[in-house]
């Protein structure tokens, strides 16, 4: 039973009430009684609107299901389908051209193209590491990953391997030649870097000296001009340092004493309360709110044990240099932080309203993450987040412009409660639901004074694609989905629409996650496609990945690329509406079994950690033991995919259950090294995680928009109650 406190007519879980009273309110000018009264007013006015929007979702989905029931199959009438979507209010008329007018936005969002980290806010260590990932060692990122192949004697080994180190140095010198070209010659083989009369002087391998091709790239240095310890440069809006220490282990092996190249990496980071966390009750929510408060105050710390030693990890201070004109130059030492609130779907028992009903969780997140954010806006906060007085909130899983307008209304009401100027709360719009995609222009317009990013989330978007057209027929195999017409159109349409609405120079246009955190060589080859596509940010799973992905923004001038793209529209709504139905279902039994096993294993591997450990995002080995970054979005695809094939008789219930039971020992083996892990097999009837995985598939067609949260939350609460 949850202990509760009466506040403002609300029944507030004591753990949340105490957090607000003892931690979040102190240091602000807010009065406790006024805050709770304001929160109660917001809940009373907006919870019914939230509920009504969810009813519209269900009503529309019901009509779509019925239409497909009468027009099933791959040869459906495209024109009739589009007309039907307009008739039911799914596809709206496109608004007249407009430009967003968001103001007070930090340059990390408006004019800097670079990587964006996403991390679960419930994990303080991850959160601090992500905040500090604004700057990253290129040498470490190359040496410690498969970005440099372990061939020709270049194995990582257990101690420093000079062969590998030399390959790292060579890679870095090639980067310098590209991002920091000299007036003549190459960075390869250089023997010295000094600052002389506000210019860079580089000694080449032959003893001659040269400067920079573009002297304006030099911004400053640390140390002394004739013996700098770090030299700061800028290229394509991103900063980087050449770090020099001839006495260091690496510097000793380098002709110029260079020990590292430090790259500006995770320019922005999303601290996530949504798909990457498992927060099902007041205790979980308060853990996240407390970590977010620490990030906003700049005092979040974590005790870390490594190599038998314990130390305190804290947030980095800003970086200072002597600029070329002799004045002090300061750069932000931390990633600019967004917070991702949950969507409109779920309710939380952290607060019960005056009638004893659970409150929409998204309303709670808006109130309490913004309350915590007040602390980052105080003038005496030396580790403040925004320098323009804004709070940045990502809002996921919205369906169409009415839901975006509701978010804007909610943010306005929260500003009133907290005494903030109008439009302090900025919104990042996740374009990850089909009804938002096809009405994206109207969605942006609904938040035209608040929008600071639009982002394609192809994982959730695929889940919604499958669920929306569940009754239309069997979809293509999961691996073939990326080759379908709709997904390329969706990605291009997002950029086209954002540029036409004036997001360039005012907001981010983002792309999705690289989900294979151990495959950095592949990421270096492939993820350059995101900046080439006109995205001025894209998601990465780790600080190391952020450093390596930053290289792509040195290779591609994103803002120049956006100007090229803006000349012509590349995608149409008609292409987006192409349903990814399989043209033929003559798959072999082996192909069907392989598809079933892959998805069953993926579901079990993720769900067992969610239910048993409360871990919402982790590296989960796939059926081939390749580690994939899984969260609720990947779970949504896998569960909806099997539900679709089951619905249309491609596989049977018996086959699905057999696959789950056969894959359970595979997942158990993959987790065998974890002493806290409880095996899924063989007690399938009593194992709550196994039951949750089964529910997600067998109840998949009836879950709201194919979301996984209702089942996960219910089963996680059940697990916590049994193991209390």
Swiss-Prot record:
Catalytic residue list: 340, 631
Catalytic activity: glyoxylate + acetyl-CoA + H2O = (S)-malate + CoA + H(+)
Quaternary structure (record): Monomer.
Top-level class of the enzyme under EC nomenclature: transferase
Classification via SUPFAM superfamilies: Malate synthase G
UniProt pathway: Carbohydrate metabolism; glyoxylate cycle; (S)-malate from isocitrate: step 2/2
Binding site for acetyl-CoA: 118, 125-126, 276, 313, 541
Binding site for glyoxylate: 340, 432, 457-460
The protein's name in its UniProt record: Malate synthase G
One GO biological process term: glyoxylate cycle
Name of the gene: glcB
Chain residues that bind Mg(2+): 432, 460
Gene Ontology molecular function: magnesium ion binding; malate synthase activity
Listed Pfam families: MS_C (PF20659), MS_N (PF20656), MS_TIM-barrel (PF01274), MSG_insertion (PF20658)
Organism: Rhodococcoides fascians
Enzyme Commission number(s) of this protein: 2.3.3.9
Record keywords: Cytoplasm, Glyoxylate bypass, Magnesium, Metal-binding, Oxidation, Transferase, Tricarboxylic acid cycle
Compartments it resides in: Cytoplasm
Modification type Cysteine sulfenic acid (-SOH): residues: 617
Cofactors, names only: Mg(2+)
Entry function: Involved in the glycolate utilization. Catalyzes the condensation and subsequent hydrolysis of acetyl-coenzyme A (acetyl-CoA) and glyoxylate to form malate and CoA.
Source taxon at top rank: Bacteria
Family classification: Belongs to the malate synthase family. GlcB subfamily.
Record keyword Oxidoreductase present: no
An annotated GO cellular component: cytosol
